[in-house]
Amino acid sequence: MRIVFMGTPDFAAASLKKLIDEKYDIAAVFTQPDKPRNRGMQMSFSPVKQLAVDNDIPVYQPTKLRDGSASEIIRSLNPDILVVVAYGRILPDDMLSIAKYGAINVHASLLPKYRGAAPIQWAVLNGDKVTGVSTMYLASEMDTGDVIYTAETEIGEFETSGELFDRLMVMGAELLHKTLTDIEAGTAPRTPQNHADASYITMLDKSLSPIDWSKTPREIVKWVYGLQPWPVATMQLGSDTFKVYAAAYTETETDKAPGSIVSAGKNGIEIACAGGQTVLITELQAPGKKRMKAADYLLGHPIKVED
């Protein structure tokens, strides 16, 4: 099967590597233009481009998709199918029908849930117990195409979005291989999505970082782990903003207002939240300091807890 692969970040690179390892005919790779990625403003390749270059696969990095030139390139490559994984661009309608088998996508949610960007993080942030990956045919509107296969996995109670990302990245690559095998064999299913059940999510940004102590302990814990590795949850101690990397449940009950410190000691910093409950902050990072256990921070910076 001759493939044109379109993708950009690590999540996509895992799928491309799987296709390379399985000896698919990769006619070319399309990826986002090179961007400056450090303080020196040096241009660097996307993970997908680097993998393609390392394997002598032709790379295209169009700045526009709707002027027809990218579509002409794809037609000249005569692919059997377009495979799109976290490319970062919406394909124009004419591009979807160029290849014999159309265009398929790997999406990191159980569609139609979590259409859009950052589905992995929002599954953790929302406290979901199960998530997964889907393969689907691309359609005109984002993430609305017919589903081919899904694969589910449980989310660990204290699993970060980064850890879940790594697992779903591998699952997505495996599911893509199965999908392509069955499409070529003519046995792949095609199930329309129930659009009434669809939900849409947005990109993350730093405005989400401050912890809302009026939430329940579980909501706060999931917020802490869902915002890792970026943008990371934050809390205020005095006038300083601390990054929060780990939190735990407690059995403490309190009549203090949400956000009040209930205790601070060898276990960490216990803070009041919704319903007279508390949550324990066990790992944090002070401004300009390294990440550390909250208990270790308190050894040099004790907190006086008011009654």
Predicted feature descriptions by range:
Residues 214-307:
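An anion-binding loop in the catalytic cleft
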